[in-house]
Amino acid sequence: RQAKVLATAFPPVNGGTSKAKRTVVTGMPVRPELEAEAGISKEEAVAGLNRAFDAGLKPDLPTVLIFGGSQGASVFNRIAPEALRSLDAGRFQVLHLAGPDKLEETREAYRDAKFPLLLLPASEKMGLFLGAADLVLSRSGGSTVAELALFGKAAVLIPYPYAAEGHQADNARYLADA
C-alpha cells in the first residue's frame, strides 16, 4: 500500500525532497486553547500568571521565557541561571519551566538571583507564558516552533543535538528563514 498524498507540517528544508508523488504542506496543528490565546496582550498574560502563581511579575519589564520542551533541558537549567545572574538585576524578569524532576537543581542554580523569577517544573498555561514573553530560549521541536510562530515571539532556539535525523535543527532553520 502507498499513500496517495503525504501531508507535512513544514516544507522540506536543506533542498530536501519527498519521494511521495504528491505532498501537501498542511502546517503544524496547534492546541485549540493556544490558538484562542494567541492574541493575548503582554499585560493580560502577566496578570494571568500573577493570578495563577502569585508571581509578582511586572508587565513593564522585559521578560525571558526559558523551557526545554516537555522533558526540560538540563543544559538550560545549568547555563541560563549563571548567564542571567551576570546581567543587571531589575532590568528584566525570567519565566523558567525546568522540566519534570529538575526543579530543585534549577532552583539551586538561581539561588542568588536578584531579578523577578517564576520557576516551575512545567505548566499547562503555555498561552500565558508565551504571551508574557519578549524573548524565548527553547528547543526547536515541531510544536514549539509552531507555537512560537503563532505567538510571533523572538526566540533563541537550541536544537536537541540527538533528535532523529537532525529534525530540530531543520525546524529552527525553517523558522529562521521564514
Model-inferred region functions:
Residues 1, 73-79, 140, 144-147:
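Short glycine/serine/threonine-rich phosphate/pyrophosphate-binding segments
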Residues 1-43, 49-54:
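Active-site-proximal region of nucleotide-activated glycan assembly enzymes
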Residues 2-3, 18-21, 90, 113-115, ...:
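Short, structured coil segments at secondary-structure junctions
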Residues 9-19, 105, 144-145, 165-172:
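Short, glycine/polar-rich helix-capping loops at beta-to-alpha or helix-loop-helix junctions
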Residues 11, 69, 99, 140-142, ...:
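Short glycine-/small-residue-rich Rossmann-like dinucleotide-binding loops
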Residues 25-26, 120, 158:
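Hydrophobic residues at beta-strand termini and immediately following loops
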Residues 39-136, 169-173, 177:
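Donor-nucleotide binding loops and adjacent catalytic segments primarily
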Residues 126-168:
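A donor-sugar binding/catalytic signature common to diverse glycosyltransferases
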